[in-house]
Design a protein with these regions (language model features):
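Phosphate-ester processing/binding pockets and catalytic centers
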Residues: 1-244
Length: 244
């Protein structure tokens, strides 16, 4: 069985567009369940213990960038450089496939106006399609795991998932989605799920890339993990940017 761990960057609300980050990014990693629950946990916990002395610390982009919640030592330049060097080396060795959808909110809104679909719904469609393609014809071959947030946002996500099971997507019928994916589970950050932490680390570098900012080592590694076609093309297969 495969697991799709998903996380987001940016606000999906079209009435709020930040000029410095006018994007909504929904990204995720597709990973084999046995690997995710055993070897992956062991590898990442070793990294945490090596860097911070314990495996309970939760890798979270917002905390890392703000030197808080256990990451206070990152304020030291030498330690910060070592941390990112070790983190990039770690992620490079891990076995997963990256998928993401980026919605350019300002362009999306100006093109479709009142008919513009909610960026979360639209990007979830894209990720579910690609997850189904990775699962293939296997019955109950996958499950989606997302981070629990607040009741309103969690309810919206439940509705988005229900909508997919009823209507399907442009390229994947509702019948195929329900056959291949057993459900969408919401889990708390405090549960320390490594898969969710890796998904969190994916989305910001992808957003920076789409904004045209300088490409750093973290995105180069993610790019090498993107789902791609037989020719190795990842644009449109692993990373979808909308509107086209």
């Amino acid at each position: 069985m495969k697991i799709l761990f998903v996380d987001e960057s940016g606000d999906h609300n079209l009435s709020i567009i930040d000029p410095s980050y006018p994007l909504f990014v929904l990204g995720g990693i597709i990973i084999e369940k046995n690997y995710a629950e055993e070897e992956l946990v062991e590898i990442v916990n070793k990294f945490k213990i090596k860097m911070f002395g314990n495996s309970e610390i939760i890798l979270h982009t917002a905390d890392i960038s703000r030197n808080r919640n256990g990451f206070e030592r990152l304020i030291e330049k030498s330690f910060r450089e070592k941390f990112y060097l070790e983190l990039n080396a770690l992620i490079k060795t891990l076995k997963f496939t990256a998928v993401a959808c980026v919605i350019k909110k300002d362009t999306h809104l100006s093109r479709y106006g009142l008919a513009a679909l909610d960026p979360y719904f639209l990007s979830l469609d894209i990720l579910v399609e690609r997850f189904c393609m990775e699962i293939g014809n296997t019955t109950s071959g996958g499950v989606i795991v997302a981070e629990r947030r607040d009741p309103t946002l969690d309810h919206e996500l439940d509705l988005a998932w229900l909508n997919l099971k009823i209507q399907g997507t442009h390229h994947m019928s509702a019948k195929k989605i329900e056959k291949r994916i057993i459900g969408l589970n919401l889990r708390s950050k405090s549960e320390n799920l490594v898969g969710l932490q890796l998904a969190d680390l994916m989305v910001s570098p992808i957003g920076r890339f789409v904004l045209g900012k300088s490409v750093k080592e973290d995105f180069k590694i993610i790019q090498s993990k993107f789902r791609c076609n037989k020719e190795g093309e990842w644009r449109g297969y692993g990373l979808v940017i909308l509107p086209k």
